[in-house]
């Protein structure tokens, strides 16, 4: 298995409601800037505290599969010390509530 793989966010019920919930979570995140916020694709930039490095986080709605695919990557460097995974898992826990 890929060490960098992040499981999608699963949802049940209405896809539009799930998408709106995700949009609200990301929009309310500290140091997040929404770059693209469409009906099935969201791209946000998260700026790190301190040095201000930018991480790109993308979400894509897969309505048929009942999931939202996630991609999170640092723009600089190879190691992020788990910051991207921790951010996505924080979003996942808020999304699951």
Regions found by a protein language model. Give the residues of each.
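Ser/Thr-rich, low-complexity intrinsically disordered terminal regions
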Residues: 1-97
């Amino acid at each position: 298995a890929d060490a960098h793989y992040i499981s999608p966010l699963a949802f049940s019920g209405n896809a539009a409601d799930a998408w709106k919930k995700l949009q609200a979570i990301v929009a309310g995140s500290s140091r997040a800037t929404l770059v693209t916020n469409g009906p099935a694709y969201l791209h946000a930039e998260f700026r790190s505290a301190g040095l201000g490095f930018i991480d790109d986080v993308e979400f894509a709605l897969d309505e048929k599969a009942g999931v939202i695919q996630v991609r999170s990557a640092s723009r600089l460097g190879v190691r992020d010390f788990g910051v991207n995974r921790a951010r996505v898992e924080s979003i996942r826990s808020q999304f699951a509530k």
